[in-house]
């Protein structure tokens, strides 16, 4: 024979039914549903904003970074060639 569980009687279901009919419970459910709705909307708009920021960065900032890096490399190559040819660097003439 299975052991009797505490709180599994018929009286408990009627107590739960009575409690769930209270106005405060329905207000709590409504507040929870509203919070979920607002959270979903916020996540959706945050995702859109992140997409816009990411694509803007890729379109505008990445080419700029690559161009600056290439300019820096060309400057280093010019400096190295100047030092190999024996011409003094620009800062050494002062």
From Swiss-Prot:
Q: Name one GO biological process term.
A: protein targeting to mitochondrion
Q: What UniProt keywords apply to this chain's record, in alphabetical order? A: Membrane, Mitochondrion, Mitochondrion outer membrane, Protein transport, Receptor, Signal-anchor, Translocation, Transmembrane, Transmembrane helix, Transport
GO MF, any single term: protein-transporting ATPase activity
UniProt xrefs under InterPro entries: Tom22_pln
Show which residues sit on the Mitochondrial intermembrane side of the membrane: 67-94
Query: How is expression of this protein distributed across tissues?
Result: Expressed in roots, flowers, young cotyledons and leaves.
GO cellular component, as recorded: mitochondrial outer membrane translocase complex
Q: Which residues lie on this side of the membrane: Cytoplasmic?
A: 1-48
Membrane disposition: Single-pass type II membrane protein
Q: Where in the cell is it found?
A: Mitochondrion outer membrane
Residue stretches spanning the membrane = 49-66
Q: How does it associate, per the subunit comment?
A: Forms part of the preprotein translocase complex of the outer mitochondrial membrane (TOM complex) which consists of at least 6 different proteins (TOM5, TOM6, TOM7, TOM20, TOM22/TOM9 and TOM40).
Job of this protein: Central component of the receptor complex responsible for the recognition and translocation of cytosolically synthesized mitochondrial preproteins. Together with TOM20 functions as the transit peptide receptor at the surface of the mitochondrion outer membrane and facilitates the movement of preproteins into the translocation pore.
Family listed: Belongs to the Tom22 family.
The molecule here is called Mitochondrial import receptor subunit TOM9-1
């Amino acid at each position: 024979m299975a052991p009797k569980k505490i709180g599994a009687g018929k009286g408990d279901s009627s107590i739960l039914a009575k409690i769930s009919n209270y106005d405060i419970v329905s207000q709590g459910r409504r507040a929870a549903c509203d919070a979920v709705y607002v959270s979903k909307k916020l996540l959706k708009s945050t995702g859109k904003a992140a997409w816009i920021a990411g694509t803007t960065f890729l379109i505008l900032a990445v080419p700029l970074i690559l161009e600056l890096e290439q300019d820096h490399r060309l400057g280093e190559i010019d400096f190295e060639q100047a030092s190999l040819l024996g011409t003094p660097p620009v800062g050494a003439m002062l």
